[in-house]
Amino acid sequence: MADIGTTGRIPLWLVGTVAGTAAIGLLGIFFYGSYVGLGSSL
């Protein structure tokens, strides 16, 4: 867990992890919403 060169900044791996998790979560919510909305008629 060496943050050499990232003093005073957020580590890039942390930004990538948070952004990736948020993106996957949002996509999951959208897919789940469309699945529930359309799944009732299928």
UniProtKB/Swiss-Prot annotation:
Record bears the keyword rRNA-binding: no
Subcellular location: Plastid, Chloroplast thylakoid membrane
Any single GO BP term: photosynthesis
Gene3D superfamilies from the UniProt entry: 6.10.250.2070
TM annotation in the entry: 10-30
Entry-linked SUPFAM superfamilies: Photosystem II reaction center protein J, PsbJ
Main location group: plastid
Pfam families: PsbJ
Membrane topology value: Single-pass membrane protein
InterPro entries: PSII_PsbJ, PSII_PsbJ_sf
Superkingdom of origin organism: Eukaryota
Record key words, sorted: Chloroplast, Membrane, Photosynthesis, Photosystem II, Plastid, Reaction center, Thylakoid, Transmembrane, Transmembrane helix
Gene Ontology CC, one term: chloroplast thylakoid membrane
Family the entry assigns: Belongs to the PsbJ family.
PANTHER family assigned to the protein according to its UniProt record, in alphabetical order: PHOTOSYSTEM II REACTION CENTER PROTEIN J
Function description: One of the components of the core complex of photosystem II (PSII). PSII is a light-driven water:plastoquinone oxidoreductase that uses light energy to abstract electrons from H(2)O, generating O(2) and a proton gradient subsequently used for ATP formation. It consists of a core antenna complex that captures photons, and an electron transfer chain that converts photonic excitation into a charge separation.
Subunit organization: PSII is composed of 1 copy each of membrane proteins PsbA, PsbB, PsbC, PsbD, PsbE, PsbF, PsbH, PsbI, PsbJ, PsbK, PsbL, PsbM, PsbT, PsbX, PsbY, PsbZ, Psb30/Ycf12, at least 3 peripheral proteins of the oxygen-evolving complex and a large number of cofactors. It forms dimeric complexes.
Protein name: Photosystem II reaction center protein J
Organism in which the protein naturally occurs: Pleurastrum terricola (Filamentous green alga)
